[in-house]
């Protein structure tokens, strides 16, 4: 279509929108690419991100404290009643405690450490008094299951962590990294060419002249396109002439 045929006597905005919809081809999966996480900020997902693991992957402690069996708590205990337990060992983050437990035992546990089998509650260390190999704390300080993060509490294996069409934020990058995924499928950047036109427009560095203004809109459009993550092609300042514009 020739420019003159497009313009006619006038050019309403809705006509421009219709023309653009006719000539712009929508992206397909052939236009998707995989990029490393360090290059993915601001890009748009071409496919859902499905979690290959549960997050967290195991029951773990939300506090530094002592893990124990919550069934030992008595909801009807007197306000000043305390529970005293033997400390059977220490569970560190990044390892699985392999010790053995007797009824009434507790395990010193760090934030993020895997909950020892058979223990489901963590009392924060601030509530505890330690005497040798025993720990004592008020029963009313917590309820069974307190301060325990369950496996899959944030995200279950096979669940969609992020949806196609989402723009990747810093938080989204962290979420993908927590799944152990080094790359993400994103749409290629939209390629957008633009220019300024008008005999009254001056380029940066031109000497001022009466009736003319410096080209500011081009830089505004450049900033908007860059912020949207587009691949920007600046065609510069084009003469206000139909043949040149063609």
Where are these regions (language model features)?
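A generic alpha-helix structural signal
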Residues: 17-21, 41, 88, 125, ...
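Short, low-complexity N-terminal leaders and the immediately following helix N-cap/first helix
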Residues: 1-78
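Short, glycine/charged-enriched hinge/interface segments at domain edges or termini
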Residues: 2-8, 67-234, 239
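Noncatalytic alpha-helical scaffolds and linker/capping helices
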Residues: 241-245
